[in-house]
Structure formats: C-alpha cells, structure tokens
C-alpha cells in the first residue's frame, strides 16, 4: 500500500495560517501505508517554529514518522514507526523544504536530484532504494513545477534518471505532485 501527499509545509492558509502537521501525522498513520511519498516537507522553518506553539522540533519528516499515541489506541497495539529519507530542494534564510519518503522498510540509500527548471521554483526528485522482504524497490518522490514547459523538461529528467540509476527489471514506484491538473504530460 502506498500514498502520496503534498503537505504544503504543514500549514494551511495565508492570512491566518493554521498548523496542520499534527492532523496530517494522524491521517498518514491511519492510512497504514508501507510507503508514503511527501512533497513540501519542512526540514527547518525558524519563523514557523517561533510562531506556532506546537511546531515539531526536528524536521517534519521525522515528526510524521513517529506514531501518534491516539492511533496506537485505535489499533489496539503499537503501530510501526517509519524509516525516513529527506531531500532538500528549496533553501532560504529561515529554513528549507523538500521531498520525503516514509517507509515501513529500511531505506538502503537515497539520492536527491535537483530538477529545478528556473530560479523561482526549486524542485527535486528524491530516489530511494527500499529493502523489503520481497527484495529491493526503487521509490522516487517527485515534485514538478507549475509551468507546463517546466513539467515537460522535469519529466524528461525523471525518465533519464530512471534509465541511468534503476537497473532494468527492478521494481520501481514513482509518485508525487506532478502539478498536471489538465493531464497533459501523458
């Protein structure tokens, strides 16, 4: 079972922002997915940390990997925590954000590739090799740009990356936010 989610940095709203990261963690764990592909994950955000009382201390990927006690109570047992990988894409004076993978299985290695198409949107492709009982799986978290031409070039970079880094015949899952609302990428 897999899931993908653009968490929009764990905050909703512009004028009166509300912290949503705690509810997101509950929802992610309730899915009971083996792999969770996340976009716009805050590795650090000093302004939000000082503004919101319950802002997570570490990176959001680490916080989301922790099992909320309410889910344990609901399931009647302690659910398994996730292994994590984080790929930083956008860096600014008060923090950074990027893509993350949460996995029920050990992550053997990770590679983060910058697929930014212009300086206004920092985008990335997080490639992880996950060690499952059935053998290794390549998992790629993608977050493509808002402009159609950018998405086309980023899709080409993704295809090139797969051809270079994923051996033929190996299991591969690619998931993410492709910003392709009109389904033009194919």
Predicted regions: what is each one?
Residues 87-92, 115-117:
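Short, solvent-exposed loop/turn elements at beta->coil junctions and helix N-caps
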Residues 93-94, 118-122, 148-150:
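Solvent-exposed loop/turn segments connecting transmembrane beta-strands
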Residues 35, 147-186:
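Metal-dependent phosphoesterases centered on the DNase I-like endonuclease/exonuclease/phosphatase
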Residues 9-14, 47, 111-116, 141-149:
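Surface-exposed cleft-lining segments at the edges of enzyme active sites
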Residues 66-70, 94-109:
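Conserved beta strand-loop-helix elements of the APE1-like EEP
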Residues 6-7, 41, 142-144, 171, ...:
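Active-site metal-binding loops of divalent metal-dependent hydrolases
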Residues 105-137:
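Active-site catalytic loop in hydrolytic enzyme cores
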Residues 1-79, 91-93, 157:
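N-terminal, active-site-proximal structural segment of metallo-dependent hydrolase catalytic domains
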């Amino acid at each position: 079972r897999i899931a993908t989610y653009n968490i929009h940095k764990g905050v909703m709203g512009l004028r009166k922002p509300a912290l949503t990261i705690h509810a997101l963690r509950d929802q992610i764990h309730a899915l009971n997915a083996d792999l969770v592909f996340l976009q716009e994950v805050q590795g650090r955000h000093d302004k939000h940390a000082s503004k919101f009382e319950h802002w997570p201390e570490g990176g959001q990927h680490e916080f989301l990997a922790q099992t909320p006690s309410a889910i344990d109570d609901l399931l009647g047992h302690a659910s398994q925590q996730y292994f994590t990988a984080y790929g930083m894409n956008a860096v600014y004076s008060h923090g950074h954000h990027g893509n993350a993978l949460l996995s029920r299985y050990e992550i053997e290695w990770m590679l983060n590739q910058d697929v930014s198409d212009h300086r206004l949107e920092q985008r990335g492709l997080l490639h992880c090799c996950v060690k499952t009982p059935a053998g290794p799986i390549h998992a790629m978290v993608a977050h493509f740009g808002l402009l159609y031409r950018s998405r086309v070039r980023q899709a080409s970079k993704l295809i090139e990356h797969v051809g270079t880094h994923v051996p033929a015949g190996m299991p591969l899952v690619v998931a993410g936010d492709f910003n392709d609302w009109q389904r033009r990428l194919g």
